[in-house]
From Swiss-Prot:
It is found in: Cell inner membrane. This is NADH-quinone oxidoreductase subunit N. Its EC number is 7.1.1.-. GO terms for cellular component: plasma membrane. It is a multi-pass membrane protein. It comes from the Bacteria. One of its GO terms (molecular function) is NADH dehydrogenase (ubiquinone) activity. The lineage of its organism: Bacteria, Pseudomonadati, Pseudomonadota, Alphaproteobacteria, Rickettsiales.
């Protein structure tokens, strides 16, 4: 029985085994070799997940974990996003000790286990695995004062988040007497008078997830951590954990808490609206690019959360499309940011970039306009689908609010373009990409943004069919 279950966790076993073996090999092998082997481990894990792609839902180890098509696709996206981070680490030419890439593998192990969790026990344990590795990665650069400072801030606030989650789990178990997700679903579905304590437990768990997503008002750690950590770690923070927790949240809301939709819908509307306001007005006075994009990320999360709150097949499809395009845009963005030293990642260093590197300036401009939601770029269709879902489901005032705040947020995206094209250079910092591999990745992301409108209908249909097949419909 348990051997049959083992087949479904081969990706996780392979990944954690690879991490432990590489940790030992790091003593005798060159650190660059370890980074390459870490990347290969992630890609092999992608292949294993693809080979073991499970269409029908399978419960593993008496319901401790779950495997189905949705979870498998989510794992593949998480693993590929993580692979892009390690690829950028390799081609950036910057020195990182061998433990860095191994810690990323451990973090990814925690994240793909988290997305497959099917009980409160596996949920909390995998949540803590990824949290502990992220604590270490945040303050990995011992020589940088800001790195240590951001690591301490992240540790303290994340520990508080873990305490809130544990308290929520204890309340949820205390009132429902259930540990498995299916048991919790049955409890909420079959009881008309749901105890207030059980609802409070759910709210506390959602708060801890909002913290990891950097949704407002649980975003306090984001600007300092983005600025203080190395740029490659900032890229990891902005892409991989966010992707995981969006997929996880969608799964929990649809599989475990559909009967509480009226309760969590109001919470998510409030959190998403607060997020876009904090993003739009918080980013305006930022000059450090990593801090600026940390606030921008809060706004993007707000869009994804409001789309999740609507809870229909179309709105959930809009969330996934938004997430995928967000990942692509961030990969292109960090192709630029990774060229900076961590202390020189300043808006003023882009002055006159059009004259020094016109191709780079054009690529940045395309990515900024796409993030702002300017047609016909990819980012426009991501925001359009979210807003149209709001209108179709009667949330017209919220849709208008989001559109107006989105127009305000265009200010800081256009400010970057203005600095590149119209300000005279007074900095010795030369932003150029001499690495051909980085150039290729940057141009690829720009091409995706430019030609996405040709394929947008097909992408919508594929995602909608995928979600409908997995019973994510409203």
């Amino acid at each position: 029985m348990y051997w049959n279950n083992f087949v479904y966790i081969i990706p996780e076993v392979f990944l954690v085994s690879s991490s432990l073996i590489l940790l030992l090999l790091g003593i005798v092998l060159n650190k660059k070799v370890i980074h390459v082997l870490s990347l290969i481990s992630l890609l092999v894990t992608v292949g294993i997940v693809g080979i073991n792609l499970e269409i029908e839902p399978q419960l593993i180890f008496n319901g401790l974990l779950k495997s189905d098509l949705y979870i498998s696709i989510a794992k593949i996206i998480i693993l590929l996003s993580s692979s892009s981070v390690l690829f950028m680490l390799l081609v950036s030419g910057k020195e990182y000790c061998y433990e860095f890439s191994i810690m990323i593998l451990f973090a990814v192990f925690g994240l793909i286990t988290l997305i497959a969790a099917n009980s409160l026990l596996s949920f909390y344990l995998s949540f803590e695995i990824q949290s502990i590795t992220l604590y270490a990665l945040t303050c990995f650069d011992k020589s940088a004062i800001k790195s240590s400072e951001s690591g301490i801030k992240y540790f303290v606030l994340s520990a508080l988040s873990s305490c809130i989650m544990l308290y929520g789990i204890s309340m949820l178990y205390g009132y429902t007497t259930q540990v498995g997700f299916s048991g919790i679903y049955n409890f909420f579905s079959n009881n008309e008078n749901i105890p207030l304590g059980a609802i409070l437990g759910v709210i506390l768990i959602l708060i801890s997830i909002f913290f990891k997503l950097s949704a407002s008002p649980f975003h306090m750690w984001v600007p300092d951590v983005y600025q203080g950590t190395s740029t490659i770690m900032t890229m990891f923070f902005s892409i991989v954990p966010k992707s995981t927790f969006i997929f996880l949240l969608m799964r929990i809301l649809n599989e475990v808490l559909p009967s509480l939709s009226k309760d969590w819908q109001q919470i998510m509307i409030c959190v998403s609206m607060l997020s876009i306001f904090v993003s739009a007005f918080g980013a305006m006075r930022q000059t450090n690019l990593k801090r600026l994009f940390s606030y921008a990320a809060i706004g993007h999360i707000g869009y994804m959360l409001i789309s999740l709150a609507i809870n229909t097949t179309v709105s959930n499809a809009a969330t996934i499309m938004y997430l995928l395009l967000y990942v692509v845009m961030n990969i292109g963005l960090f192709c630029i940011l990774i060229q900076y030293d961590d202390d020189d990642c300043n808006l003023l260093n882009l002055k006159g970039l059009h004259n020094k590197s016109p191709v780079i300036a054009f690529c940045i401009a395309v990515i900024m306009l796409s993030m702002a939601g300017i047609p016909p770029l990819a980012g426009f269709f991501a925001k359009y689908d979210v807003l149209s879902s709001l209108v179709e489901n009667g949330f017209i005032k919220i849709a208008v609010t989001f559109a107006l705040v989105s127009a305000v947020s265009c200010y800081y995206y256009l400010k970057i373009i203005k600095v590149m094209y119209f300000d005279l250079s007074d900095s010795s910092c030369d932003v150029s990409i001499s690495n051909k591999k980085l150039c290729f990745v940057l141009l690829l992301t720009v091409v995706v943004n430019l030609v996405f409108f040709v394929f947008v209908g097909h992408v919508r249909n594929i995602i909608s069919y995928f979600l409908h097949f997995n019973f994510f419909n409203g």
